[in-house]
Amino acid sequence: MLRNGAQNGNINSESHESFGKAAKGFRIFSSFSSSQKLFQRRSSGSITHSPTALSSTTSLNENDGNHFRPASSLSFSPSSLSRKDSGPGDGLEVNKKNNFYRRSSSTDDFGISHARSRKEIQSLGRPHTRQSFSVSDVSNGSSYPNIRKNSVHVNAPMPSFPEGSTAVLLKHHSGSKSASAISNIAPSHSNSTSSRRPYIHPAFLSQVAVEFRKRLNIGDRVKDGLLYKDAFLGSEAVDVLMHIVRTTDRNLALLLGRALDSQKMFHDVTYSHRLRDSLKEVYQYRRIISPPPGLSSMDSNGSSIENNFLYTKRRANTSDSFDSVLSDSSTTPTISSSVQVNSLAFITSSLSAITKEPEAPETEYNPHGVFTLLTECYSSTCSRNRLCYSISCPRRLEQQARLHLKVQPVLSGGSTSITDKQEEDHRLWSENVPKQVVDQIDVREWKRQEIIFEVIYTERDFVRDLEYIRDFWIKPLSTSNVIPENNRQQFIRCVFHNIMQIHAVNSRLSNALNRTQTLQPVVNTIGDLFLDYVPKFEPFIKYGANQAIAKFEFEREKSTNRNFANYVHEVERLRESRKLELNGYLTKPTTRLARYPLLLSGVLKYTDKDNPDTENIPRVIEMIREFLTKLNYETGKTENRLSLLQLNEQLSCSPADRAKLTLFDPSRLLIFKGVVKLKASSYSNGDTENDIHMFLLDNFLLLCKIKIQMKRRVHKLHLRPLPLELLSISYIEDSPSRGSLPRRPSSALLTNPISITKSNPPPVKAYGLQLVFIGARGFSISLYLNTLIARDQWKQHIEKQQDIIRKRHLVFESRGICCQSWFTGNKLLCAVAYDAGRKLLFGTYKGLYISSRKSNNGSCLEPIFKLQLPNISQLDVIEEHNVLLLLAEKILYELPLDALDSVEQINSKSLRRVTGHVSFVKTGFCMQRILVCAVKSTVLNTTLRIYEADRALKNKKTQSLKKPFGNQATLKIFTEVQMPMEALSVHFLKTKLCVGSFKGFDIISLENAVFQSLLNPADTSFRFLEKREDIRPIAMFRLRGEFLLCYSDFAFFVNTNGWKSRQSWMINWEGQPQGCALCYPYILAFEPDFIEIRNAETAELVQIIMGQNIKLLTDGRGLISEGGEILYSTEPIPFSSGENPIVHSLILPPANAAGPAL
């Protein structure tokens, strides 16, 4: 079995030298029983047999975690062909011989590989073998010791142990007399029947990978000025791994992370090195970007469909022809800047034509295998007191750690390797110039020349990398049949885009730098060269913006075209590829652009003040940073658009919800996404049924569940899309989820840095979020996350976007005009404005108040009490007739407006009683008259008593306050109409009345009292109203020759004949409004918790104004009172300091108004 020995020192990821030293002490061994023979490397480089345990060394590889085995011969010389596989500066090497070694694609740094048959294990002539075992072998514990004793590799993936199976396995280690490494890590199992969190075995990479994804919080990270989405830092990964394996040893967590990295679970964003415990290194998950279903139906030849996906159509006489993509001359035509837009347009067209297809492959990749450093010793005779013969025995490492001893390497001299030709090049300026030149300059100038030399040779390497892409990818793919001919040109343009334009610019820059270095061993200035070429760096922006699409198409073609997948595998194994995959080369242009400011800043640091570079280099750096800003913006736009299109394809919802989301809108944004739980206990018992996938858009929050529909994996909406304006988010008090309670440790002494005492795993603490949706169909839902950081991120993202929406959609401005402190011990019931809005009247429980408006901000002066009259529920003003109408205790009164001008308080005897038993009153203009409709309504019938203002008394001034009306009444009875139903609202038309009841809107003729429904019964589109008995009419507005009918649940248009117009136009209110107002082009619906403002032409929700117990006071239709104003009241905020307004005025700025549309 493979065993890992590790130096117990600190692995410093930032220091290449120290890390290289630490890696020398970490070796991987293959150990067999004593009856087998040992391959032992001699000084001559050959391998001979030895009758001891087998040991072969391979150091940790920074770029490739694969092991190699001899194909046939057992005697060979590895020194003839070996190369350095480590990343830059890591100092980790591996020796190989290609003639005898075969690469295993799934083997990692710790000996994880594909399984071999049992027959091979029995042959001593084939020592490098692997053995597989099934779930039953593990569960019954019968085969595990034999596997640990005789096999080199354990097959992956490892199954999850059932309850108590770990204890069964440990019983077979009969030689173990005390707790060992794995027994310390593994918790004991009791007979408790309570739900427990699934045990995570730290040696099983599949389990660690799943837990790693759950606990690690990904997001936006910045490296060298470039923004990376869904990324994480190296130190964050190490922190999470330490928590998973419950250790304080960062070195061990780093090694475990590299085991995951070696199987490409994640990668450095520059693809240049392995996992490092650093705050400066950024990593991303490897995601197999599967194509949307319907686009992955290519056969192995890739010719089953015509692939228009992500490509632009060829145009006649186009400048960006296929030959121009391969050209790197100075006259390379400029590819249109609309390539990304056109490509995404083809995504949309392709997605719309998708048919039912099998489920797409998973987009997440998790490694499988065993991390042997955290496993139990395989030997049955091994114990802590008496160690076995293996030098890599975990107990030996544990013993050395206790004694603070250094783990000794197997081979004292280490192995030699022949590095790649590019690695052999001298990378120091002092090694490339005569010694006398170095001796003539001071230390400051020497450092400056070294950095300049680094700029020059890294630029040369960059150009070589671009030429590698041209020679090994673009040209071969353009001339071979790997890609179907009908898609070949489009594929190359999509994946490689304008990379040869970058080569055209940077090759000339590199030549200029090389020329300067050749002519001047001590380079004086380089800023002037960059000033000439940096303005030509525009291709970098276009290339970076296309990178997300390029990666998507590359992965799609590789998953659907077997020939292309084989070609990729073969080319990436070539020596010229330097064991770097194509994605690593495709990211080099963007990472190179980000490296320029760092390199040039180093040059500037050691540049003398009298050198021209002190002025030129800052200008160059500023120009490059502007390019980086544009690059981040364009890249973010493309990635966002691609994510939205994928979401649109995977989303399963109703057509109405899909139309509401408008995912194809260019301004739509996908801000954040993640997985949460519906139950806190799901984290303890491993339940995935309660997983909710949340997507935060710029306008909605989506809660989805993964479902399989028609053999497709889709995101089905768990709830309807939630508008962010109506969402309230808060924390739930933290509490551990239900699970097994922690037991008292068996020992307080933890001698092993990675060991913990035997106990049940502690209960997982779930951190809850409470989402409250406000509206008619409002609800509350609790969601749980496993980390505080994740919970805080969701709350911050949602609240930040809510603030952005409020500021962006500020159509109406709400201004407080009256404070609660003015009505202490009283309650406001109604209000009305008159005198062109300069004066306000307030009706309260106690009586009538009057106030004047301030000219600067529209707020009120402190109201003056004018009339003692209890429970004034409605006020209305007829300024043309100088009359104030008051409804109090269901009695309608009238009072001349002139009486309000008196300083004295008005006597209630001055009021004139008009009529009683009035439910509500409505004033309007009909039949060329000003009419007042007093509604006496019951459940069974309604009496409409209509009054007319006497024209003879119009504008007549009152002479006496004792008898303000003299012997003549202002309101005279006009007509009276009886209705066999309860009236809810009244609206005046030109010659008729429109009365709203539970049955809908009815038209009443005032001449003959004839009823007829406003809706034409012949229109079948009103059938849905017959099933809705709970709705009630709210208001009706005349708009451009049509009528806008507002109900408690919805609103729609009808024409003058009662037929529904604008068939596709419909408003479904988010709440259940109790009042409506029209301020064209906006319709406002007033619900107790918020005001819903929509565009009356498009039905789009444009603004939400929140409040408590909102009530519409005046709707602003000032046909009688000039200067109509929309007023509403709210409940005061409890315990609020400062002003606490209860009456508000809605102000529509002139820029947002569209004028009357009556």
UniProtKB/Swiss-Prot annotation:
GO BP of this protein: ascospore wall assembly; division septum assembly; fungal-type cell wall biogenesis; positive regulation of regulation of ascospore wall (1->3)-beta-D-glucan biosynthetic process; regulation of ascospore wall beta-glucan biosynthetic process; regulation of cell wall organization or biogenesis; small GTPase-mediated signal transduction
Pfam families recorded: CNH, DEP, PH_5, RhoGEF
Record-annotated PH domain positions: 670-805
Protein name: Rho1 guanine nucleotide exchange factor 2
Main location: cytoplasm
Cellular component GO terms held in the UniProt record: cell cortex of cell tip; cell division site; cell periphery; cell septum; cell tip; cytoplasm; cytosol; division septum
Subcellular location(s) per record: Cytoplasm
